[in-house]
Amino acid sequence: ILVIASLPTSNFAKTLDYISDMFPVKDRAEAKTLLAESVQAILSQMLCHSVEGGRAICREVLLRAEGVPTAIRENNIAALRQIMDSYRQQGMRTLDFSLRELLATGKITASEAYARATDKRQFQHFLVGY
């Protein structure tokens, strides 16, 4: 089964919440379990203001890997971010990592990157050099 959906969410955590919230409260735990068992990938993207005046695309990729189903089932967003960082070589990436790449290559400003970051406290530590 192939399911492709376009949802009004900006990252994997909001996507998981959005899907879960479609179900009645009493059914959400079961919905999370089904989602955890079936999800193969969640791709998110957002457009950032580019220093050149246009837009720069920022991507987030969550792929099925060891630990992902359990973290989804338990709604453990921090664990999912750690998994994404650990599996970067396999193509996963957090939104904040993509923002750091765009900033490091001069495609977006530090203020734009910070405004779009999902973990502002952690991102602020990265911005010290900018």
Language model features: what each stretch is:
Residues 1-130:
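Short, flexible helix-loop junctions that flank or precede catalytic/ligand sites
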